[in-house]
């Protein structure tokens, strides 16, 4: 009798494992971001200036800046440029947090400038559209979230195009 129980238990464990794995959606990290390479004639410094100008024109404040590559270089680690820019409209951020404090984990909006091994730079941000769709926001907050998404993409596009 014990011989039958072991295979049955093992079979049940395998079936349960397969069910759990099938029921758990996998998330490809690449699907959660938007990437925009800089145009060939756009320097990294011009891209940064363009993003800052566009953000200012759209009333989004640059609330934080992290030149990660400088920190790495100060530790003796070779690094191409890795710079993280954080933009925010404080009023919208507060409204989102008031609705659901979990949104605070996604604030402020971040754009990373990443210089590749070939010197080509890319701007990368979280795909806000992916999260907006699943957030079950009331209509007024949905409108504001879409505005944030569009503004961040506009800031990125200005940087990618060198739109001074």
Where are these regions (language model features)?
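Bacterial N-terminal signal peptides
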Residues: 7-18
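N-terminal secretory signal peptides
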Residues: 23-85
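Short, intrinsically disordered, mixed-charge
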Residues: 53-57, 98, 102, 157
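Short C-terminal domain-edge/linker segments immediately following a structured domain
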Residues: 66-67, 94-95, 114-119, 142-146, ...
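Surface-exposed, polar helix/loop patches in the mature regions of secreted/periplasmic/lumenal proteins
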Residues: 85-140
């Amino acid at each position: 009798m014990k011989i039958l129980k072991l295979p049955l238990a093992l079979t049940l464990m395998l079936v349960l494992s397969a069910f759990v794995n099938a029921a758990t959606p996998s998330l490809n990290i690449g699907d959660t971001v938007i990437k925009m390479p800089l145009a060939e004639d756009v320097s990294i410094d011009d891209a940064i200036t363009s993003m800052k100008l566009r953000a200012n024109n759209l009333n989004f404040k640059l609330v934080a800046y992290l030149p990660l590559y400088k920190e790495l270089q100060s530790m003796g680690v070779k690094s191409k440029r890795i710079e993280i820019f954080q933009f925010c409209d404080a009023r919208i951020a507060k409204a989102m947090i008031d609705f659901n404090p979990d949104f605070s984990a996604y604030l402020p909006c971040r754009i990373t400038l990443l210089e590749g091994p070939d010197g080509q730079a890319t701007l990368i941000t979280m795909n806000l559209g992916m999260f907006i769709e699943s957030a079950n926001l009331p209509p007024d907050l949905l409108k504001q979230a879409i505005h944030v998404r569009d503004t961040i993409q506009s800031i990125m596009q200005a940087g990618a195009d060198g739109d001074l």
